[in-house]
Amino acid sequence: MLIREFISEANKSQMITTLLKHYKVGNVRVKLKSMKNHAHYNVDTGTLELSTRYKTIKSSQVKEFLITILHEIRHAMDAKKYGWKKFKDMYEYEMNLMIAKDKDEYKDNKFEIEAEDFGQNYWKKWNTRFKKEELI
């Protein structure tokens, strides 16, 4: 088996599309953006903004990449479930609550914790599937 150093652009796109469709948020647009964070789900535009650091993905970055994409997909799922405006209000309320409790508005935010758990819990499943499909 040949070990590829980089994941092709086509394979990366196929993985993202598969994940979005599976979790029934296929209408989410994906765009690369220069940013400090790995990714961000822009609830106002319904766009998953992916850091340009993921323009090319090394095989050693697949775990981090899958966790990141799944994390942001969870936010998209919440926005679909509650409606984007209500989800944005709920998220901001949670941020303000954490600040009032002198906690970190991101790391202690229940929506971030749930999204991170989602990514951590499902990345292996998708890693196995994408390996079988020879996408990674």
Residue ranges and their predicted role:
Residues 1-7:
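Short acidic, low-complexity intrinsically disordered linear motifs used
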Residues 100-136:
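Long, well-structured alpha-helical subdomains associated
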Residues 8-26:
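Zn2+-dependent metallopeptidase catalytic core
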